[in-house]
Amino acid sequence: MRILGLDIGNKTIGVALSDPLGITAQGITTIKRKGEDRDIEELKAICDKYKVEVIVCGLPKNMNGTLGPQSEKVLKFCNIIEEVINLPIKMWDERLTTVAANKAMLEADLSRAKRKKIVDKMAATYILQGYLDRISK
């Protein structure tokens, strides 16, 4: 069963995909946002191509666990994804995933330009891997 992981931002959507057994996550692309309809179209194409059965979306909570304005945007977009693509959506607490992704890239000594290109895809990978680890227990 393939599972898609998403890190949804205002300008980009990081996308990660599980292996067929649902054990490991791998970043596959970063979608540059071009409007709701086109974003959904791209996500649907990815879901169709890889025969995705579930989508895990990172939910950006505040450090105290409350939901802020960005969370509301993400929840609204995820509701639209669920309606249009017709796949179940699971929300995953994404606190500190971008921080962890940036830290890993700094430790790998990647340049700022290279980090900027892949940070969202890496954050999506962290989100999806966290979910996969949880469901495998």
Curated annotation (Swiss-Prot):
One of its GO terms (cellular component) is cytosol. GO terms for molecular function: nuclease activity. It is found in: Cytoplasm. GO terms for biological process: rRNA 5'-end processing. This is Putative pre-16S rRNA nuclease. Its main location: cytoplasm. InterPro entries: RNaseH-like_sf, YqgF, YqgF/RNaseH-like_dom, YqgF/RNaseH-like_dom_sf. It comes from the Bacteria.
